[in-house]
């Protein structure tokens, strides 16, 4: 393909139309989501009007923006955000006529909402967000598109997406919609974005158009059963039917609430809509009228079912350690910057404290003098069965105790255990064989240690032996 070396041909201009539609697979079922977008290195333009198809069109040179803050419903945030005016963007070419990358960055944020508090919306004509800082939380109130009714207790960056807009240059200039998995994220949320580029300066013969995408778009992805129902309800019926809907039919959704469907053939404005059937019994195209909002009604009635199925994934039977998080609590902790493990009031992981306790008991059994060493309180910790010491142990005390039982190497531990086993065996032989074997077995220190370990590992599944 010939490449024009004209200076302007190396810098074609396009009108960028951006749409940010929705975010799906959000772990939380409540809260707020919004997206910030920006073009790296700006737009490279300064004009506000271009001549397109013989008409002057007003454009924008903004290189960043923000969607509205929307409430998360059924683990989905729907913005349907679009630009008021297309953005005039200047792209650059290399010596081979290929586009240099122009990156569009999307930053997706999630805001945690306190369900126990509510705020009064202030009257603002432009719908701007008002921020009020409290001692431990930030309360946001807004009107217009941003509808806050709860106190915002924290903000979290869910993830980012980098899109090379030069890959969306198409000669037919049709919009392209893709789904992107969030990067630098701990969740599998997917954002739906649509891009369209229209050439306003230069010619398509001046550059090479990319034939593929390299930004990790998800192809042929369906976010859930709601979208499947919406799409299938719009498809044509494969065969004609004689079953006609009554003037007013009522069916129950999954909440037990009756939903009324208006008479087919008329919508809310009185205009009829129809779906053509490709085949019929008399080989003629027939028409079946339906209400255009029916698919939306079915989709809405399915939402509680989807919610229920989603919740059940967090309630699978399992055997957690005492005091540990449930799967839902684990996800919440990770999203708030934690590691997914429950902690005591001093910030020490309970699983680490449990491991310390088991190792101390093991060391105490194999080394009788371990608890009598200076500065070592292993035999007296925890002080009583009702106080496990988890809520009071700080980081310093934990590190000191951990160092006390880890001062010996693994080989030294094994040698000490072998020596103690031989001493115990010789002592048992000296006692004589006149004692009852059952009594000796009941007072065996090994059984006592096993019982103590099982008491602390009550989360383990014990399979009964045959």
From Swiss-Prot:
Sequence ranges assigned to domain C2 NT-type in this UniProt record: 4-199
Family annotation (PROSITE patterns): C2_NT
InterPro entries: EEIG1/2-like, NT-C2
Pfam family name, one: NT-C2
Range of residues in the leader sequence: none
Bias kind Polar residues: ranges: 266-298
Modified residues (Phosphoserine): 433, 439
Residue segments, region Disordered: 262-298, 374-393, 400-452
Keyword field: Phosphoprotein
Note: Present with 396 molecules/cell in log phase SD medium.
Family statement: To S.pombe SpCC1494.08c.
Full protein name: Uncharacterized protein YBL086C
């Amino acid at each position: 393909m010939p490449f024009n070396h004209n200076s302007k041909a190396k810098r074609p201009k396009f009108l960028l139309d951006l749409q940010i539609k929705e975010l799906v697979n959000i772990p939380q079922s409540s809260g707020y989501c919004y997206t910030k977008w920006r073009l790296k290195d700006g737009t490279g333009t300064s004009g506000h009007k271009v001549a397109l198809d013989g008409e002057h069109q007003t454009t924008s040179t903004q290189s960043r923006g923000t969607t509205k803050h929307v409430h998360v419903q059924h683990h989905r945030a729907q913005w349907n955000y679009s630009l008021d005016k297309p953005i005039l963007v200047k792209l650059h070419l290399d010596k081979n006529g290929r586009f240099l990358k122009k990156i569009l960055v999307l930053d997706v944020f999630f805001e945690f909402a306190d369900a126990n508090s509510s705020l009064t919306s202030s009257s603002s004509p432009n719908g701007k967000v008002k921020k009020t800082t409290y001692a431990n939380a930030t309360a946001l109130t807004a009107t217009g598109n941003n509808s806050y009714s709860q106190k915002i207790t924290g903000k979290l960056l869910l993830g980012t997406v980098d899109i090379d807009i030069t890959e969306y240059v198409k000669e037919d200039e049709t919009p392209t919609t893709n789904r992107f998995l969030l990067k630098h994220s701990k969740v599998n949320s997917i954002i739906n974005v649509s891009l369209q580029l229209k050439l306003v300066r230069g010619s398509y013969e001046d550059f090479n158009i990319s034939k593929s995408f390299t930004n990790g778009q998800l192809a042929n992805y369906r976010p859930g059963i709601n979208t499947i129902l919406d799409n299938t309800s719009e498809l044509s019926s494969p065969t004609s039917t004689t079953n006609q809907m009554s003037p007013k039919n009522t069916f129950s959704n999954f909440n037990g609430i009756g939903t009324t469907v208006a008479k087919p053939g008329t919508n809310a404005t009185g205009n009829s809509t129809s779906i053509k059937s490709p085949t019929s019994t008399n080989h003629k195209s027939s028409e079946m009228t339906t209400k255009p909002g029916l698919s939306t009604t079915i989709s809405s009635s399915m939402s509680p079912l989807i919610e229920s199925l989603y919740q059940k994934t967090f309630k699978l039977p399992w055997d957690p350690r005492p005091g540990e998080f449930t799967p839902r609590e684990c996800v919440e902790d990770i999203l708030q910057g934690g590691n997914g493990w429950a902690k005591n009031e001093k910030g020490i992981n309970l699983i680490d404290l449990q491991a310390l306790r088991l190792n101390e008991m093991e060391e105490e059994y194999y080394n009788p003098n371990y608890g009598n060493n200076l500065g070592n309180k292993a035999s007296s910790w925890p002080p009583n069965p009702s106080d496990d010491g988890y809520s009071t142990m700080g980081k310093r005390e934990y590190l000191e105790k951990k160092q006390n039982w880890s001062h010996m190497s693994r080989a030294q531990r094994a040698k000490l255990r072998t020596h103690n086993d031989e001493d115990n065996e010789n002592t048992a032989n000296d006692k004589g064989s006149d004692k009852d074997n059952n009594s000796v077995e009941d007072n065996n220190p090994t059984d006592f240690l096993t019982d103590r370990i099982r008491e602390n590992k009550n989360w383990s599944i014990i399979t009964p032996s045959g």
